Amino acid sequence: MGRDTIADIITSIRNADMDKKGTVRIASTNITETIVKILLREGFIENVRKHRENDQFFLVSTLRHRRNRKGPYRTILKRISRPGLRIYSNYQRIPRILGGMGIVILSTSRGIMTDREARLEGIGGEILCYIW
């Protein structure tokens, strides 16, 4: 795990998805917990539980699977703003992913939220990642 916890989440989920694993283990921080709750609420993952191991907390999340096929859904996650190049947007210029089918996760002054929530509240922020 590196210093960019958001990139670590995205990489862990993407690698587990490509490797057809059912669960992902992610180091638990406030940012990772909030992003995983958004993914759970939006239906990209099925289940999340907090696991403690040697005085460290981990989030164990179950990836969403198709009903008739054994493999997980192909979830595409893309990191946008990174430590070397921050990308900011006001609420009017937040991009729509696949015409509203995907989501944009933003870090705003009121916390981490999706693009729909930011548009409703009329606030912009740092674009963390795209998910579709």
From Swiss-Prot:
Locations listed in the record: Plastid, Chloroplast
PROSITE patterns: RIBOSOMAL_S8
Chief location category: plastid
Superkingdom as given in the UniProt entry: Eukaryota
Cellular component aspect of the GO annotation: chloroplast; ribonucleoprotein complex; ribosome
SUPFAM superfamilies from the UniProt entry: Ribosomal protein S8
GO biological process: translation
InterPro entries (alphabetical): Ribosomal_uS8 (IPR000630), Ribosomal_uS8_CS (IPR047863), Ribosomal_uS8_sf (IPR035987)
Assigned keywords, A-Z: Chloroplast, Plastid, Ribonucleoprotein, Ribosomal protein, RNA-binding, rRNA-binding
GO MF annotation list: rRNA binding; structural constituent of ribosome
Quaternary assembly: Part of the 30S ribosomal subunit.
Protein purpose: One of the primary rRNA binding proteins, it binds directly to 16S rRNA central domain where it helps coordinate assembly of the platform of the 30S subunit.
Similarity comment: Belongs to the universal ribosomal protein uS8 family.
Annotated protein name in UniProt: Small ribosomal subunit protein uS8c
Protein's organism: Nandina domestica
Organism lineage: Eukaryota, Viridiplantae, Streptophyta, Embryophyta, Tracheophyta
Gene name tied to this protein: rps8
